Swiss-Prot record:
InterPro entries xref list: Nict_dMeBzImd_PRibTrfase_arc (IPR002805), Nict_dMeBzImd_PRibTrfase_sf (IPR036087)
SUPFAM superfamilies: Nicotinate mononucleotide:5,6-dimethylbenzimidazole phosphoribosyltransferase (CobT) (SSF52733)
Origin superkingdom: Bacteria
Molecular function, one GO term: nicotinate-nucleotide-dimethylbenzimidazole phosphoribosyltransferase activity
UniProt feature coiled coil, ranges: none
Organism this protein belongs to: Acaryochloris marina (strain MBIC 11017)
Family as reported in the entry's similarity comment: Belongs to the UPF0284 family.
Name of the protein described by the UniProt record: UPF0284 protein AM1_5137
Length: 369
């Protein structure tokens, strides 16, 4: 049900250590105007849809299927929101759950911890966020990482994200940190929009001017990042000192890991790399139009683990389409599937049945006739 793709010894040791332990599930919401660019993401069929995706996902993650949500899940080009995977798992297994608002355009319709951030401009501007906001969000991340780690006790944290356009800002961070990532990142598209991402990143870094980004990683986030990245980086650093941390995502969380490592070096912040893992889905890792394993190896140190969950036998075409490379990941879907297996031994059919039941309830409530 699980496979370790990089750093095999460290990855298997982490999985063994946290087998049978209950995690705390935290999802950090953010927004970047990068997500409004035509065709940049499939997390919403139109830019108008994508401007509300994080709000709809947050509402679904908190409430599950409802007859009249404030923000209905947006119609996707293909497939369904990955919140359809995360919600039934964390609620069935009673993971404590917390939503964090790192920077959204609108107030979420459900309870969140407001970190006093703001939505980011498009990364191509080279001025995505004001530096003081980035510094504030990082400090908030450090403090909340400590708090969540205390609550986790001998368990671990699942740190997830919801940022439409977030793989593009991830490419911006990785490029600024000196990694050669062309062709390696993923997206919600079945075939990754590499050229579009590359042009956005090059424009953003050019607008920001020549800087020593390795010496100024927070300034790099201010230039081409998004508000989620620096929050999760802060959480990761402090939480890793005392408990396990699963960064739940693919490209975006590899970028967060690389960012956090650089920040910790520059600011001499102690952290514990052995307590960290990146957890995602097979759909991300096996995406032929990206190369997550090569990216993880290039970033180095952190184990990359993926659930082997498949929707090939689902009775719903909206789930089968995941096998063609649509959607792939988001809001901790892969991390929750990994945790479901670790904590209660859930197998393929357990997860598939839970997700299909959620989808059935969703459609029944949405269209009772």
């Amino acid at each position: 049900m699980l496979r370790v793709y990089t750093q095999l010894e460290r990855g298997n040791q982490w999985l063994k250590q946290y087998e049978g332990r209950s995690p705390i599930f935290a999802c950090v919401l953010g927004f970047t105007e990068t997500g409004l660019i035509p065709n940049v993401s499939t997390a919403g069929a139109t830019p108008a849809d994508r401007s509300l995706t994080a709000l709809a996902d947050a509402e679904f993650l908190f409430n599950g299927p409802q007859s009249q949500p404030t923000y209905p899940l947006p119609d996707l080009a293909q497939g369904v929101s990955p919140a359809m995977i995360s919600w039934p798992i964390y609620t069935s297994q009673n993971f404590p759950f917390q939503l964090f608002n790192a920077g959204l355009r609108h107030s979420p319709p459900v309870p969140t911890v407001d970190l006093r951030g703001q939505a980011a401009r498009c990364l191509s501007s080279g001025m995505a966020l004001p530096l003081p906001i980035v510094e504030l969000l990082f400090q908030q991340g450090l403090e909340w990482g400590e708090t969540l780690a205390k609550q986790a006790a001998d368990g671990y944290l699942i740190l997830a994200e919801c940022v439409v356009g977030g793989t593009s800002t991830a490419q911006g961070i990785l490029t600024g940190l000196g990694f050669s990532v062309a062709g390696q990142v993923n997206s919600s598209h079945p075939v990754c929009n590499h050229q579009q991402k590359h042009q956005l990143v090059e424009a953003g870094l050019a607008q920001a001017g020549q800087q020593d980004w390795l010496a100024h990683p927070l300034a790099l986030v201010a230039a081409v990042g998004d508000p989620m990245q620096v929050v999760v980086a802060g959480m990761m650093i402090t939480a890793s000192r005392t408990c396990g941390v699963m960064l739940a995502g693919g490209t975006q969380m590899l970028a967060v890991y690389a960012l956090a490592r650089q920040i910790s070096q520059i600011f001499r912040l102690p952290w514990t790399p052995d307590n960290l893992l990146v957890g995602t889905t097979r759909w991300v890792v096996e995406d032929p139009s990206g190369d997550t394993v090569a990216l993880a190896n290039q970033v180095g140190e952190v184990p990359l683990v993926a659930t082997q969950l498949s929707f090939a036998t689902s009775r719903y075409p909206q789930l089968q389409i995941f096998e063609q490379g649509f959607v792939k990941e988001g809001v901790g879907a892969g991390g929750c599937a990994i945790a479901a297996h670790l904590y209660q031994g859930w197998q393929q059919n357990d997860i598939l049945n839970a997700v299909e039941q959620t989808l059935e309830d969703y459609y029944r409530l949405r269209d009772p006739n």
